Amino acid sequence: MLKLFYQVKKREGQIMDFNLSKEQLMIQQMAQEFAEKYIEPVAEKIYRENVIPEEIIKGLAELELFGIPYPEEYGGADGGYDGYVLAMEQIAKASGGVAMTISAHCLALSALSVFATEEQKKRFMTPACKGEEIASFAFTEPATGSDPKQLTTTAVKDGDHYILNGTKRFISNANWPGVIVVFAVDNETNKPTGFLVEKWCEGYSISEPWDKIGMHGGQLLDVYLKDVKVPAENVLAGPGMGYPILQLGISFGKVGVSSTALGGILAAYEEGLRYSKEKMHRNAPIAKFQSIQLKVADLAIKYEAARWLTYRLGMLANNVKDPRQFAREAALTKTFVCDTMCEAARISMDIHGSYGLMNDYKVARIYKDSIIGPQIEGVADMQRMIVAGVTLAD
């Protein structure tokens, strides 16, 4: 067996390498330093007020964190989705709400990066990648949820424009200026179609933010479209092409959701570890007790398993050859990592004991944040159905 191993190594010139490259380490360190210096000190304020300070947005933009995976020619940092995962993990460790804002932004930009024309990319991606604008992705509706076959938002062709009417629910970043990818049924194909709409155009309005349980700062709002006039040149990938955009775009979105959950797991791990060393009982840190040691071990195991699965998804996203297989990998990663964040948050809370129930402690915020992941970008059972469908079809 060893002989075969060395033959393969010699033939291919290398073996599987789990070390981060210099470029990846640089992205990780940059995001970590920014998160610790600027986000962590105001994380509780963000959570309390459900608003991300503009100086945080400006700082993220200066570091090109809004455009890490995208090409430089469109204002991006050309850091790949692997770099995106590393940065998002560090941002999410400090604030799930800030990470959620970036994740939703990149969900929209990933759809543009694959399906937009050159002109559309330059017009809409460039300011968004630079952080001058923040993008949104508007699919979910009040009565029909996230079912593309039941969309009620309409797009009626009127000369060289479309007139959009409808309501979208739980839309991230809807209050920030920038492009919003809106899905509506057009009257020509009677199928879902993606439209690039500029937020705050005539007929565009929003609700107050929903008061959700966690990920505060990453606001969710309803979007109201009343006779919104959209140029035909703003159709994404052509009339009736909404479903492929949704399928692949949301798969890319799960890279961000998984990375955000991974950062939450790391935060739960670090908070539990720190508290176990600091909290004294009978003149010794509680880390001396075997029951606490078992919980710390579980946190370490869960973090490492989630970390490598998420890092792998980032690498896969750099070169998607088969959208169906990528959908499977994105779904299984998102399911595992988001479920694991729930488990890790609970374990860390158990280590804290009654103090974990107090909002003064970060672990309480992590616990409430953990509930969000399994419900967004497709609920957990739907993700399992995607995994099963592709697996059984092979």
Task: Identify what each model region corresponds to.
Residues 131-139:
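A short, Trp-centered hydrophobic/proline-enriched beta-strand micro-motif
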Residues 9-94, 98, 115-119, 129-132, ...:
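Alpha-helical interface subdomain recognition
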Residues 150, 202-231:
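Flexible, small-/acidic-enriched active-site or ligand-binding loops
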Residues 5-6:
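Aromatic (phenylalanine/tyrosine) cluster motif
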Residues 161, 165-206:
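A short core secondary-structure module
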Residues 227-244:
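Long, acidic (Asp/Glu-rich), low-complexity accessory segments flanking structured domains
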Residues 128, 143-146, 170-173, 185-186, ...:
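Short Gly/Pro-enriched turn/cap motifs at secondary-structure boundaries
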